[in-house]
Curated annotation (Swiss-Prot):
Residues 29-81, 141-160 are extracellular. Residues 1-7, 103-119, 182-211 are cytoplasmic. PANTHER family: CLAUDIN. This is Claudin-7. Directly interacts with TJP1/ZO-1, TJP2/ZO-2 and TJP3/ZO-3. The phosphorylated form interacts with EPCAM. GO terms for molecular function: identical protein binding; structural molecule activity. It is found in: Cell membrane; Basolateral cell membrane; Cell junction, Tight junction.
Length: 211
């Protein structure tokens, strides 16, 4: 039987993970490549994100450029963008639904079984959102590894994992765990716990008839 403390813990974890997914989607450090050119002074660090690519000079100045065409992007990057956006939208809906079903709120009425079902629905939506983000981060991570070990890829254009991927993985894990805790609000378990078997009392001897 889920209590309000467990629901609050799950909701907090899921919300924290959702904020991490927002940060991961926004920052451009999904892929990073640091290398020095012929001149040490012109050393550059290149980053690729979901929406833009950036170049950081050795002086610390960063210049970013949005992608010109969506159709020109690799398939893995397009799929990752779509999955991350879907994950963020589902996470927002899950927070709204879970808030109505939590025991510590007055939304959703006073019916405990109904609120438990609402909280469980919010937890399931959180799990779907976490899975979408996990697939997105793992997909582009697999693509980075494949390109890195491809002998046909020049050394100066090979990329490694950026911090955004690790933030995305951590956020996905928190959303999944938080959704799992909220999903423990199963109405069936509460109804069983609330059931009390009627007591049976022995018949009194005074009710016997004597002949």
């Amino acid at each position: 039987m889920a209590n309000s403390g467990l629901q609050l813990l799950g909701f907090s974890m899921a919300m924290l993970g959702w904020v991490g997914l927002i940060a991961s989607t926004a920052i451009p450090q999904w892929q990073m490549s640091s290398y020095a050119g012929d001149n040490i002074i012109t050393a550059q660090a290149m980053y690729k994100g979901l929406w833009m690519e950036c170049v950081t000079q050795s002086t610390g100045m960063m210049s970013c450029k949005m992608y010109d065409s969506v159709l020109a992007l690799p398939g893995a990057l397009q799929a990752t963008r779509a999955l991350m956006v879907v994950s963020l939208v589902l996470g927002f809906l899950a927070m709204f639904v879970a808030t109505m079903g939590m025991k510590c709120t007055r939304c959703g009425g006073d019916d405990k079984a109904k609120k438990a079902r609402i909280a469980m629905t919010g937890g399931i939506v959180f799990i779907v959102a976490g899975l979408a983000a996990l697939v997105a981060c793992s997909w582009i991570g697999h693509q980075i590894v494949t390109d890195f070990y491809n002998p046909l890829t020049p050394m100066n254009v090979k990329y490694e994992f950026g911090p955004a991927i690790f933030i995305g993985w951590a956020g996905s894990a928190l959303v999944l765990l938080g959704g799992a805790l909220l999903s423990c609000s199963c109405p069936g378990s509460e109804s069983k716990a609330a059931y009390r078997a009627p007591r049976s009392y022995p018949k009194s001897n005074s009710s016997k008839e004597y002949v």
